[in-house]
């Protein structure tokens, strides 16, 4: 099985077999064609199905799903945010509005902490989510990550760029 995490600007992937996570890889993916997705994700033999968590949108999802179909005979399976998973209850009235990346991080954080946790993730965006001891997702926030924040500050200020 191939596990794939597609963020806003980078993709991370690893094979998972009999409880063991294989070699992990990552790359920026801007503008990749279906052939580039196939070359990147299917370097190792033996992938029989693909599971994807993606915040990259429908066009990227379609490319990855088709790449999976061409390589395995089956389209990729995409994880969706739900009302409840792994003992964690989603705080959002409309679960799909919480990014799957944040949802998976909150459920994994709760499982790893065996209770209350606060999960931070920093990439293109920076996110923070909390989960109570009894598994209630408290919500959180998303803000620009460091690079986007600096570009915003440099573009919106006259003197900051010369001092950084």
Specify the residue positions occupied by each region the protein language model found.
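N-terminal glycine/serine-rich phosphate-binding loop of ATP-dependent small-molecule kinases
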Residues: 1-85
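Gly/Thr-rich phosphate-binding beta-strand-loop-beta motif of the actin/hexokinase/Hsp70
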Residues: 1-22, 109, 115-137, 153
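Fold-independent oxyanion-binding glycine-rich loops
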Residues: 6, 54-55, 81-82, 101, ...
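Conserved active-site and cofactor/substrate-binding residues in soluble primary-metabolism enzymes
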Residues: 32, 59, 97-104, 144, ...
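Flexible, glycine/proline-enriched loop segments at strand-loop-helix junctions
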Residues: 54, 92-97, 137-141
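Acidic-glycine-rich active-site phosphate/pyrophosphate-binding loop
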Residues: 74-86, 124, 158-164
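Conserved phosphate-binding catalytic cores of ATP/NTP-utilizing and phosphoryl-transfer enzymes
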Residues: 84-117
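Glycine-rich phosphate-binding loop plus the immediately following alpha-helix
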Residues: 111-114, 138-164
């Amino acid at each position: 099985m191939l596990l794939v995490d597609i963020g806003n600007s980078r993709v991370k992937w690893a094979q998972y077999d009999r409880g063991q996570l294989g070699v992990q890889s990552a790359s920026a993916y801007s503008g990749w064609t279906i052939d580039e997705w196939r070359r990147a994700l299917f370097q190792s033999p033996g992938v029989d199905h693909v599971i994807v968590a993606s915040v990259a949108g429908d066009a990227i999802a379609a490319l990855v799903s088709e790449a999976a179909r061409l390589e395995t005979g089956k389209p990729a399976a995409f994880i969706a945010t739900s009302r409840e998973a792994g003992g964690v209850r989603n705080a959002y009235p409309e679960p799909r509005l919480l990014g799957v990346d944040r949802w998976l991080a909150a459920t994994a954080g709760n499982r790893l902490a065996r209770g209350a946790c606060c999960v931070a993730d920093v990439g293109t965006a920076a996110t923070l989510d909390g989960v109570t001891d009894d598994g209630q997702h408290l919500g959180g926030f998303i803000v620009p990550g460091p690079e986007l924040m600096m570009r915003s500050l440099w573009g919106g200020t006259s003197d900051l760029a010369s001092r950084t």
